[in-house]
Structures are given as C-alpha cells and as structure tokens.
Amino acid sequence: GVILENDEEIYADNVIMVVGRDGSNWLNGVCNKHGIKMTNNQVDIGVRVETNDIVMEEINKTLYEGKFIYESSVGTKVRTFCSNPSGHVVVENFSGVMLANGHAYNDPKLGSKNTNFALLVSHSFNEPFDRPNEFAMEIGSLSNKLSNGSIIVQRYGDILKGRRSTYKRIKEGFVTPTLKEAVPGDLGLVLPYNVMKSLIEMVEALNYVTPGIASDHTLFYGVEAKFY
C-alpha cells in the first residue's frame, strides 16, 4: 500500500505509480531507500532517419506508418517507429539532453517534401550495470558535446565511408534537412559499434522493401532515444 502526505494509509495488493520518464531517477531512489526490488526495462537507442517522400511513397500511401522489426547479426532487435510523411525533424529536450525526434502537421500546407522515422536498437542490462536510462543519456550527452549543444546530422553514404559529413556534402545531397540547426558530424564517434552495425543492417534490409532508403543521400540524425 501507500502512506499519503496527510499520513493516511491505503492498503492494496498492487500500487501503480505514474511518475513519467523524468521521474524515473526519483522512483529509483525511493525503491532503493525502502528495499523494493526493481526490474529494469529496455532502453532504445538509435537515430531519426530522413529521406525524400518519393522513396517512402508506397508505404506512406498504403500504411501511413510501416512497422518493421529486424533481428541483427549481433543479436539486437531494430525497429522503425514514429514515421512522419511530409514531416519535420525536431529537437526534443529530455532533462537537458537534446535528442532527435520528428513530427508531421495535419495541414498539408505546412508539410515538407521529406519523410522521417526513428530507427531504434533495443538494449537490456543486468549486472554489473543496471541503469539503462543513464546509458542512453550519456550517449545523448556525447552527441550534444560534439555538436556544441545541438543534434548531429550525417549522410548515410558518409557513414558507410567512415567519414564525417560536412555542410558542403549535406548541401550537395538530394535530401534537404528539415532540421536546419542540425550540425554535420560523425555519429560513428557517438554510437556504440553494435548500435551502428544494427542500424546499417536494418537500412540495407529496408532497401528491399522501399528501394532508395539505403541511398548515400539518406540522412541520420542523432541521437534518438526512448526511455521506459
């Protein structure tokens, strides 16, 4: 049960606490203080992908948001999430860490010529490390440092070549970034090997479903993370 602020005691077999993602650290402290056993959920780490609407046209028109899951060669699960046809990539401020996200407007007049969606790699931890949210926050913080407090954007072709993207190469690409403040950089310096390898394998697999997504001009914004 629970004891309320006015000292009222409520007895129950099960208690649901709704503290939100920002309240996870507080809840962790409360559980540790009172010896309450906890089970950690997974954390998802990845990127926001952006390409031309025409590449995603069939999926956009038929499904609006396709749901694809891929088992990588390193044993991770990769999934697509939150697709936004004719949408915009945006910045999400999560407890002071800038993360990539995306949205689309209901009014077609406000739309772009690009589709964006998340590619997320799931990670679970046990011992000796059992703080998955902290792990994702550290990766997001590193991305912020390398982009001077912003979001990194990188061409898929530059990722495959192992080089950072530059403003010149981004400008010469066929996909115009909708997040103008994103800073060209190298996500290979931020994302762990298993994450990057999983993302590349997923994009190559998606290319069979929606040809053109594995183009050199496809953009990766990082980092995107989902906390549970």
Question: Which stretches of residues belong to each language-model region?
Answer:
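Residues forming the flavin
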Residues: 1-228
